[in-house]
Swiss-Prot record:
This is tRNA uridine(34) hydroxylase. Signal peptide: none annotated. The keyword Kinase does not apply. GO terms for biological process: tRNA modification. One of its GO terms (molecular function) is oxidoreductase activity, acting on paired donors, with incorporation or reduction of molecular oxygen. SUPFAM superfamilies: Rhodanese/Cell cycle control phosphatase (SSF52821). The active site is at C180. Residues 126-220 form the Rhodanese domain. Gene3D superfamilies: 3.30.70.100, Rhodanese-like domain (3.40.250.10). It comes from the Bacteria. It comes from Trichormus variabilis (strain ATCC 29413 / PCC 7937) (Anabaena variabilis). Catalyzes oxygen-dependent 5-hydroxyuridine (ho5U) modification at position 34 in tRNAs. InterPro entries: Rhodanese-like_dom (IPR001763), Rhodanese-like_dom_sf (IPR036873), TrhO (IPR020936), TRHO_N (IPR040503).
Length: 305
């Protein structure tokens, strides 16, 4: 990795009452742009959630700027690195929720599950009385998860409450352990489950990313790679970039064995979207792929000037 061009990727969130969140949008965006930072930050009445990338100095400056607000002074973040900028632009968006469960009455500022550190996680999920639930979407679970974890097979986090209502019983499932990418979805999910009468609800502090950062591979109960929402696609232990790519057509993460499928055609289809492609859709996708390659070839040529 070229140290001079290394991008620091910082992910952070905090559930905290921000009644003035709309007033923070413009000055925060201006400061990030001045620091040559790219990424996305979400602001809502319930808190802040963001992933940004830039130089070491710029990231430190933005985090200091955020923490200057006393409500965010203990804002925690996780870091990883990227060889190239993982984001194309900087956005600061106003939202109803910083992670969308679709139930505004669920408030992690009022109640939340018990945090479990990465060092304590293996022992917890090895307990046969504990049901372990991956709160992420099905396409994320597809490329990696913890041993023995349940996959709710959701397409959206909004689907999670219905999964709980249909499949879990507070009287039967006494101990529940949950995890997600960085921890934010589990804050909402654990708050929801407590409201449904589940007594012992645990979640992985810092999420999968903190676990992969702190737990060595030889001690790990993680299997596969962890999907991330930027151009790295996936990361492994030590938060090093993984090997997965995205299908250009449907966006599903693909391993090398997925690309060996007869239904895979670069830029056109994979086994997850092949059956949904009509001849008309295939023709449009071929043109879309051609335009993408043309654009990239022009960009590459300009970079050599």
């Amino acid at each position: 990795m070229n140290q001079e061009n290394t991008q620091i990727v910082a992910a952070f969130y905090k559930f905290v009452s921000l009644p003035d969140f709309t007033e923070k949008q413009v000055p925060l965006l201006a400061y990030c742009l001045a620091q040559d930072i790219k990424g996305t930050i979400l602001l809502a009445k319930e808190g802040i959630n963001g992933t940004i990338a830039g130089s070491r100095l710029s990231i430190d400056n933005v985090l200091s700027y955020l923490r200057a607000d006393l409500r965010l002074q203990d804002l925690e973040h996780k870091e990883s690195t990227a060889d190239t900028p993982p984001f194309e632009r900087m956005k600061v968006r106003l939202k109803k929720e910083i992670v969308t469960l679709g139930l505004p009455e669920v408030d992690p500022n009022e109640q939340v599950g018990t945090y479990v550190t990465p060092e304590e996680w293996n022992e917890l999920i090895s307990d046969p009385e504990v049901i372990v639930i991956d709160t992420r979407n099905d396409y994320e679970v597809h490329i990696g998860t913890f041993q023995g974890a349940q996959n709710p097979q959701t397409n959206s986090f909004r689907d999670f409450p219905e999964y709980v209502r249909q499949n879990l019983d507070p009287n039967q499932h006494k101990k529940v352990a949950m995890f997600c990418t960085g921890g934010i979805r589990c804050e909402k999910a654990s708050s929801f489950m407590l409201s449904q009468g589940f007594a012992e609800v645990y979640h992985l502090k810092g999420g999968i990313l903190k676990y992969l950062e702190q737990i060595p591979p030889e001690e790990s109960l993680w299997q596969g790679e962890c999907f991330v929402f930027d151009e790295r696609i996936a990361v492994v232990h030590g938060l090093e970039p993984g090997t997965h790519e995205l299908c250009f057509c449907c966006g599903h993460p693909l391993a090398e064995e997925d690309k060996a499928s007869p239904q895979y055609e670069e830029g056109i289809s994979c086994s997850h979207c092949f059956d949904s492609l009509t001849e008309d859709k295939r023709t449009r996708q071929q043109e879309k792929w051609r335009q993408y390659q043309l654009k990239n070839s022009h960009s590459l040529g300009n970079s050599k000037l």
